[in-house]
């Protein structure tokens, strides 16, 4: 399961691009009439996008949905942002698991840094989908807060639910 989390961001909220939600609402989120923690398979992997400013909130979501944090990717962008304390040039993709899911086979373990250009607002690099597909081939895939559809993935967001 991959998720782009629409955290509220104080005075820097992406509200002009899409509606945002408080962390508590994301933790209690229902899709297709059921809590996310019940939608995800008993044995599942969660890939959760976040930024430095929302890292602690992302960990709350992981816990609320019944997952255990394991590792992360860093998406290093080609353009630098404004930042608060430092000028941010990356996003973080947290990896969490629940149930009987182990790490990917050694041949399917990618490097932790993804180098890819920044695209439209909130659009993640296609390389990430390909990494997830290689890491866990054969597992069903669901993207929450999706901006696009992708073959072999179920998508849910404020644009569609397929």
Model-derived regions: residue spans:
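Class I S-adenosyl-L-methionine-dependent methyltransferase catalytic core
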Residues: 1-162
